[in-house]
Amino acid sequence: MFEGPLQDLIDELSRLPGVGPKSAQRIAFHLLNVDPDDITRLQDALGAVRDGVRFCRICCNISRDEVCRICNDSGRDRGLICVVEEPKDIQVIERTGEFRGRYHVLGGALDPLANVGPRELTISTLLQRIGGVLDDRELADSTPDTPLLDDKPQIHEVILATDPNTEGEATASYLARLLQDFPDLVVSRLASGMPLGGDLEFVDELTLSRALSGRLPL
């Protein structure tokens, strides 16, 4: 254990995903030895993210504006929604060049052990986009502070692109059951080729491209 600000820095770094105590210590000592201007740039970047990044009011993706670049793109199919867990998953799918619809970011996956239920995700916002009822008993108290949409295009298909692990599969199954209430809506899941137990973030572009092209109805 170190004393004072150094230990405080190590403790804060250890709270970051994927950063253990040893890695946090290495980062802290690295920061002690870098040029002060580098520290200032890091502080500025963190402040800019805190103050300048928000969530798109339509799809809940990260954005600098009220509506993100993808939702503002008139060349995309507004009736096709790909549901992902996190904003980083959008970047992976975009790199394939296969998908020309819009997205919806859940903000995670259902995980009872971590106390993540429907109320902690943007499921009610997704239903709102499709035209669902917002006073569903399971979701009535779950809505993040997302304004009502100004427009409601006719949604014809929802692709469930949650991670192919236990939590992602449970989330996809839950959403598929909810979306059965919309008889004209096609609900599909990414096709085979996705590794079970993995994260979408680490799937290569070719595998993901084939999965998108060969998606199957649920």
Curated annotation (Swiss-Prot):
UniProt keyword terms in alphabetical order: DNA damage, DNA recombination, DNA repair, Metal-binding, Zinc, Zinc-finger
Record-level Gene Ontology MF annotations: DNA binding; zinc ion binding
Zinc finger (C4-type): 56-71
Domain Toprim: 79-195
A Pfam match: Toprim_4
Entry-linked InterPro entries: DNA_Rcmb_RecR (IPR000093), Hlx-hairpin-Hlx_DNA-bd_motif (IPR003583), Rcmb_RecR (IPR023627), Rcmb_RecR_Znf (IPR015967), TOPRIM_dom (IPR006171), TOPRIM_RecR (IPR034137)
PROSITE patterns from the UniProt entry: RECR, TOPRIM
CDD domains on file: TOPRIM_recR
GO annotation terms (biological process): DNA recombination; DNA repair
Function recorded in the entry: May play a role in DNA repair. It seems to be involved in an RecBC-independent recombinational process of DNA repair. It may act with RecF and RecO.
Family to which the UniProt record says this protein belongs: Belongs to the RecR family.
Protein name: Recombination protein RecR
Higher taxonomy: Bacteria, Bacillati, Actinomycetota, Actinomycetes, Mycobacteriales
Gene: recR
